[in-house]
Amino acid sequence: MPNKEEKIYLTADSFKQYQERLQYLQEVLRPQVIEEIKEARNQGDLSENAEYDAARDKQATIENEITEIQHILDNYEIIKTQTNRQVSVVRIGSNVSVVSLKDDTVINFQIVGALDTDPFNGKISNTSPLAKAVIGRKAGEVVEVEAPNKYQVKIVHVG
């Protein structure tokens, strides 16, 4: 889990999904599992009661997820999308195109927070080596990516 002071960057959609999930956990699943525990207790001896043990395990899982989501929602920052025409500096939320200086491969991606990362759909974490290299830079700049095998890319588009 990230440090208390560390910002957790989320898209507006992810933020809404976390809010909805938290509400579902608190208002639906938590009461259900409490009822399951009550029913299992009524079956008598708790020392060999598989239903009771399963309900308690389920309760622990739900409570852990609630705690994790509450932490996220206590430390989030919504990624602002860049809509104006004067977009020039790469930041979290930017759509970026770079070209590898090694083999002229073009890479298109959006920089998102770690919880929204989806590399198969072109969304990379702001903590990834490529994102770290381009954040704060402008189109036209050449940057070195600090990866196990360092490489250079030229930023060709920021949007």
From Swiss-Prot:
* An example Gene Ontology biological process: regulation of DNA-templated transcription elongation
Question: Could you tell me which PANTHER family the record lists for this protein?
Answer: TRANSCRIPTION ELONGATION FACTOR GREA
| Gene3D superfamilies given in the database record | Transcription elongation factor, GreA/GreB, C-terminal domain (3.10.50.30), Transcription elongation factor, GreA/GreB, N-terminal domain (1.10.287.180)
Protein name stated in the entry: Transcription elongation factor GreA
Keyword match Transcription regulation: yes
Briefly, what is this protein's role?
Necessary for efficient RNA polymerase transcription elongation past template-encoded arresting sites. The arresting sites in DNA have the property of trapping a certain fraction of elongating RNA polymerases that pass through, resulting in locked ternary complexes. Cleavage of the nascent transcript by cleavage factors such as GreA or GreB allows the resumption of elongation from the new 3'terminus. GreA releases sequences of 2 to 3 nucleotides.
Q: Which GO terms describe its molecular function?
A: DNA binding; RNA polymerase binding
Upper lineage ranks?
Answer: Bacteria, Bacillati, Mycoplasmatota, Mycoplasmoidales, Metamycoplasmataceae
Q: Name one Pfam family in it.
A: GreA_GreB
SUPFAM superfamilies, A to Z: FKBP-like (SSF54534), GreA transcript cleavage protein, N-terminal domain (SSF46557)
Family (UniProt): Belongs to the GreA/GreB family.
What does the record list as coiled-coil region(s)? 47-77
